[in-house]
Amino acid sequence: MPKMKTKKSAAKRFRIRAGGSIKRSQAFKRHILTKKTTKNKRQLRGMTVVHASDVASVRAMLPYA
């Protein structure tokens, strides 16, 4: 059986936490920022957890994580 390949695009976007949950960075922070409020941009800075319905597909992309 050959080695499974990690999807490199997913490896750059997701990190597995110690408890097993997956964290990701927020979207909507790259451009068109003038119309967004300061509060909105500040809240987009942090990381968030991947939704439960998406965890299985992310784990399939990261077999060795």
UniProtKB/Swiss-Prot annotation:
Family: Belongs to the bacterial ribosomal protein bL35 family.
SUPFAM superfamilies in the record: L35p-like
GO biological process terms held by the UniProt record: translation
GO cellular component: cytosolic large ribosomal subunit
Name of the coding gene: rpmI
Protein's UniProt name: Large ribosomal subunit protein bL35
HAMAP family: Ribosomal_bL35 (MF_00514)
UniProt xrefs under InterPro entries: Ribosomal_bL35, Ribosomal_bL35-like, Ribosomal_bL35_CS, Ribosomal_bL35_sf
Pfam families with a match to the protein in the record: Ribosomal_L35p
Record key words, sorted: Ribonucleoprotein, Ribosomal protein
GO molecular function: structural constituent of ribosome
